[in-house]
């Protein structure tokens, strides 16, 4: 039987969970694009307020956890495991990834203020430039991780390391593991 909804992978597949987060980020970025065309025509109507609320919720709650998953668990595990070409690539990519996380957080603070006003119905203004910059940063960042970091993790991390990564991600979200 097929389901009507996409289900998220379990924490026993931590790299798949991170990819699922990227897919959700892409959906939120698409919502921001839709808001850019919706607001000039309809203003901060109920649809716009709900869309702003959804984007706010994702980028203030889920996205920071995703960054912590990478910074506190995934990237350190890769650093301790990688050798030769993988170690050289990580040495090159890690500073860039960390810098991108900081830049995305800073750019988010600009958008967050605008989206809160839309959510409250007090403004229908959303900066196209801010949206484009934020989206471009995230899309580039996710491509980098999906092209280099995720395949490396799948290739070099042991089952035990994957299990620890998944358990840390689950705990970070306050999800109690199944007793089974």
Sequence positions of predicted segments:
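Small-residue-biased structural context
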Residues: 1-180
């Amino acid at each position: 039987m097929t389901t009507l909804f996409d289900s998220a992978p379990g924490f026993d597949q931590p790299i798949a969970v991170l990819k699922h987060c990227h897919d959700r980020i892409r959906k939120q970025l698409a919502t921001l694009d839709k808001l850019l065309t919706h607001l000039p025509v309809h203003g901060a109507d109920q649809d716009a307020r709900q869309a702003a609320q959804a984007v706010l919720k994702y980028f203030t709650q889920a996205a920071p956890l995703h960054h912590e998953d990478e910074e506190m668990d995934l990237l350190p595990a890769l650093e301790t495991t990688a050798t030769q070409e993988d170690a050289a690539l990580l040495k090159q990519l890690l500073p860039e990834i960390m810098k991108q996380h900081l830049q995305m957080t800073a750019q988010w603070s600009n958008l967050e203020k605008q989206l809160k006003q839309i959510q409250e119905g007090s403004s229908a203004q959303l900066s196209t430039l801010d949206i484009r910059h934020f989206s471009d940063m995230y899309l580039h960042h996710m491509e980098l991780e999906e092209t280099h970091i995720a395949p490396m993790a799948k290739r070099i991390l042991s089952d035990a390391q994957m299990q620890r990564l998944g358990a840390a991600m689950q705990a970070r979200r306050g999800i109690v593991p199944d007793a089974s």
